[in-house]
Amino acid sequence: MLSAFEKALFFLLVAGTLGLAWFTFRWMFGAIRRGDGQLHLNELPRRVFRAVEVALTQRTTLRARPGTSVIHLFIVWGFVYYILINTGDLIEGFFDVHFFGDGRIGGVYRLLGDVLSVLTLAGVIYFLVRRFIAKAPALTFRENVPLHERARPGIRRDSLIVGLFILVHVGSRFLGQSFAIADRAGDPWQPAAGLVARLWSGLSFGTLETWSHLTWWLALGTILAFIPYFPYSKHIHLLMGPLNYFSRPDRRSLGALEPVDFEDDSREQFGAAKLEHLQQTHLFDAFACIMCNRCQDVCPAYVTGKELSPSALEVNQRFELKGVMRGLAAGEDSPRPLLDFAISHSAVWACTACGACVEICPVGNEPMFDIMHIRRDQVLMESEFPAELQGAFKGMETSGNPWQMSDSRMAWAAGLDVPTVDDTDDYEILYWVGCAASLEPRAQQTARALVQVLQAAGVKFAVLGERERCTGDSARRAGNEYLFYEMASANIETLNEVAPPRILVTCPHCLHTL
């Protein structure tokens, strides 16, 4: 048990370290609140359950890299259990009690602590070896990917600090248990610590007590020393990852974008040119990022050698935010545009908007949406976009399709006796054909085959015919939200007039938009 002086010292250290961390967290969440939109906190019970379930099961992590993910799972369980262990050690330090006692419950408590300590230590050693000795390619970025000036050395330094913190914290506590076991001549509930305790069999009672006392301070002292650094470290994902799942928007589909209110006369910025223009949930993403690069593994642009890395985008924003979050929280503007530090102009237009990065992220980050918002700024505010898109935008605006083709949208149906909504009211399905199936010869085969299936099945259907226009999804993904807004408004008017019972589509762009 601690002396009165040690108890007072501990309280002072706790107050100091929590005070320092409080200022950082206040700046962090103040910077996040500078973003556009809001964090989503509706249906709290469901959101809390989702956050806890994802954190404890690690199901989103286990979707890729199964071996590494299982090791990470043990570390997570160890971290969660160590909240209980540290609470117990704190109580034992301040009061002359044995946490959970010496009975069966206390035995199970110590057994789980013993097993999880070993698994955690082994897991952290594995990850340190993987990063610093094996230098796993999955944890690196290609040289052509733009990185924040502080990112490349910062990632390695931060990983080392976090790894050593866990080793010292868990290792000190584990050694402390071995000294205590040697002091009381064994504990069958702690087999691993018991093996280490044999090394101390020749030490005196006083020496064992001293080392047990020192390791108590070392184990809990490392936490106190780490807490002020915690908000700046990658370890912050332990808090921000579950909170990200807790506060992220509920999307009806993987790539569903937030609409822009063009009727709001007070709005001066469309899209994201600077950090504070991003959605609040996407600023949250930067702090939740684990820097595992799983999104990079599945990014088709990165795999084919482009400058785009979804992981680098989040990492770059994270390092910039760490430097400017105090000013952002105070109401200042961020000093640099996103294209100066977060992502290159080439990388912005390399994204295919496939959503693979969103689907794979263990903590629910959405780097694809950051890119979509940057594109909105480039198109709507700066009129900067690849020349190839000019023709597509013009085609969607004037011809109702991205290829500027003036062909009939019913040419594909020649000889099939396909009814339009102007021909009949007796139909149960409106087949939305889409631009490709209407105008592109290979895709027309899909439309014809589907119609033949519907006719053979006796399904009553109709198409819009010449009234059908592109849904504008390609314009939206390319950042031209206003063109999409105009096209969507026209399509909504048409659909409200027709009022179809059900809609059938074969185009994924049409599906997402409708």
Residues covered by each model-derived region:
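Iron-sulfur-cluster electron-transfer modules
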Residues: 2-133, 277-286, 312-314, 321-514
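Juxtamembrane inter-helical linkers in multi-pass membrane proteins
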Residues: 32-55, 135-154, 188-200, 239-268, ...
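Hydrophobic alpha-helical membrane-insertion segments
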Residues: 73-84, 160-184
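A conserved hydrophobic secondary-structure block that centers on an alpha-helix together
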Residues: 115-118, 123-167, 171
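Membrane-interfacial helical/loop segments at transmembrane boundaries in membrane proteins
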Residues: 91-108, 141-150, 178-211
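Juxtamembrane/interface segments at transmembrane-helix termini
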Residues: 21-40, 91-95, 126-141, 175-189, ...
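Alpha-helical membrane-embedded segments
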Residues: 13-21, 120-124, 167-168, 210-246
